[in-house]
Amino acid sequence: MDSTTHGPRTHVPGRLFIGLMSGTSMDGADGVLVRLDGPRPEVLASASLPMPAALRDELFALNHAGANELERAALAANGLARLYARAVRQLLDQAGLQPGDVAAIGAHGQTVRHRPDLGYTLQLNAPALLAELAGIDVVADFRSRDVAAGGQGAPLVPPFHAALFAGGQARAVLNLGGIANVTLLEPGRPPRGFDTGPANVLLDAWCQRHTGQPYDADGRFAAQGQVLAGLLEHLIASEPWFALAPPKSTGRDLFNLDWLLARLQAFDGPAPQPQDVQATLQRLTARTVANAIDASAAAPRDVLVCGGGARNPGLMRELAYCLQRPVHPTDDAGVPAQWVEALAFAWLAQACLDRIPAGLPTVTGARAARVLGALYPA
């Protein structure tokens, strides 16, 4: 796309938005083109583009201190914007639409630092470049406004979960990306939500290290092993973050391969087999989700699961075992699990344009709800 796409918007019934998300797993960029003026989002097109290996490696590296970080971060952000622009082109082509038909893009960017305790969160993104390439207004930098108001800046999806899935009974909505986060929906109460701990971030890293595959497809590697109860308890007991009360959030800054290797080295027991570690990590995700829900005093009747982890049948079985209640992908409620986060950022972009506060103090701990995001006009 080039500057010839810029210009006045044509009329398309309803307001159309694009949501773009690349999560903690850094496996690719998910995008949706959606109509948001009805009672439920209407997905007109969807796309998932794999992350180029060189960009993925650089983004991984930028999660840790290193040489020449500023220039490398700027170049990686530009690379991500170009990947996003390819996703936008694919979405428009699928739907037979032009850039002027879309009100705005909500682009999350790639989190490389998340330190709300120090007053900042950093998502690599180049929204100005994306606006130029796509010819569509871009809303980005959703998290920092909440952090400025004293909040965690995460999770941001609970108000969207509430809009989609709230009903007459208590339920939980669990997002299994790199990090797991849960939204608690209880009649008569504002939504609550918080991160519960690692999900795919450790599963993917360990699988990559021992099989060469970027993720554990269908949980097959974990299925070759067995849960090591002693190791599981060691992983939980050795990490103070698990015992923190909400509001709380986390990321790859804390939970990463180095975190896991340090705890394996400190484990007072026989050296575990790689497949047993994978099975134990799968249980770790499920157990910490269950522990967090139990500690919240919520009593959800069921749990709806979205994100990449919803496609892992082994992990879904572990969740059902640990939660002792029905566990279903959000597909069963009419919303494809793979696209929920991208849909959420389309929804957040609309809220920003309409100047509707979308942060929830009951989730992030901010002083008050704020309008989230910054606008980069095309």
Curated annotation (Swiss-Prot):
Q: Return the broad EC class.
A: transferase
Named in its record, the pathway it takes part in is: Amino-sugar metabolism; 1,6-anhydro-N-acetylmuramate degradation; Cell wall biogenesis; peptidoglycan recycling
Swiss-Prot/TrEMBL catalytic activity = 1,6-anhydro-N-acetyl-beta-muramate + ATP + H2O = N-acetyl-D-muramate 6-phosphate + ADP + H(+)
User: Would you say which domain of life the source belongs to?
Assistant: Bacteria
Molecular function terms, GO-annotated = ATP binding; kinase activity; phosphotransferase activity, alcohol group as acceptor
Which cystines does this chain contain?
Answer: none
Q: Which InterPro entries match?
A: Anhydro_N_Ac-Mur_kinase, ATPase_NBD
**Keyword tags:** ATP-binding, Carbohydrate metabolism, Kinase, Nucleotide-binding, Transferase
Q: What is its EC number?
A: 2.7.1.170
Q: Does the keyword Transit peptide apply?
A: no
Swiss-Prot/TrEMBL GO biological process terms: 1,6-anhydro-N-acetyl-beta-muramic acid catabolic process; amino sugar metabolic process; peptidoglycan turnover
- The stretch of residues making up the signal peptide is none
- The residues that hold ATP are 23-30
Homology family: Belongs to the anhydro-N-acetylmuramic acid kinase family.
What function does this protein fulfil?
Catalyzes the specific phosphorylation of 1,6-anhydro-N-acetylmuramic acid (anhMurNAc) with the simultaneous cleavage of the 1,6-anhydro ring, generating MurNAc-6-P. Is required for the utilization of anhMurNAc either imported from the medium or derived from its own cell wall murein, and thus plays a role in cell wall recycling.
NCBIfam families for the chain: PRK09585.1-3
* Protein name as annotated: Anhydro-N-acetylmuramic acid kinase
Give the species.
Bordetella parapertussis (strain 12822 / ATCC BAA-587 / NCTC 13253)
Tell me the name of the encoding gene: anmK
